[in-house]
Regions:
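STAS-like cytosolic regulatory interaction modules
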Residues: 1-60, 70-127
Length: 127
């Protein structure tokens, strides 16, 4: 599996044998959603199984949830596997309060491979 930088320090993509993992970084708010939506739309249409990793996301608002729902629905509509990795208590609470557990199906990190070390993400800047 290799890490592909997509020109945005808030997004990293890994692909291997039909599985694509998207790691998001920072605050998943309207500003970030507008920046990463085009890339996620392409991946939701074209990638095999898609995992979105929110373990480096520090905040998520309604626009972030909307992006995730859109992505999950597009992936599943083509019969591909969808997975959302999330361990942030407030994001998990937001998903529950919005009644999106069945749509997004968040998985705890303990059931997934660990995230890439920060030094593996060239050009990543903390915000």
């Amino acid at each position: 599996m290799h890490l592909i930088r997509r020109g945005d320090p808030h997004l990293a993509v890994r692909s291997s044998e039909g599985l694509t993992t998207v790691e998001l970084y920072g605050e998943l708010d309207l500003v970030l959603v507008q920046r990463v939506r085009p890339e996620l739309d392409v991946l939701a249409r074209e990638a095999g199984a898609l995992t979105v990793d929110l373990r480096h996301v520090t905040f998520c608002d309604a626009s972030g949830l909307g992006l995730l729902v859109r992505c999950a629905q597009r992936v599943r509509s083509r019969g591909a596997a969808w997975r959302l990795l999330c361990d942030h208590p407030m994001t998990l609470r937001l998903i529950r309060l919005a009644d999106l557990d069945d749509v997004l199906r968040p998985s705890p990190p303990s059931t997934a491979a660990p995230p890439a070390p920060r030094h593996d993400v060239p050009g990543h800047q903390r915000i």
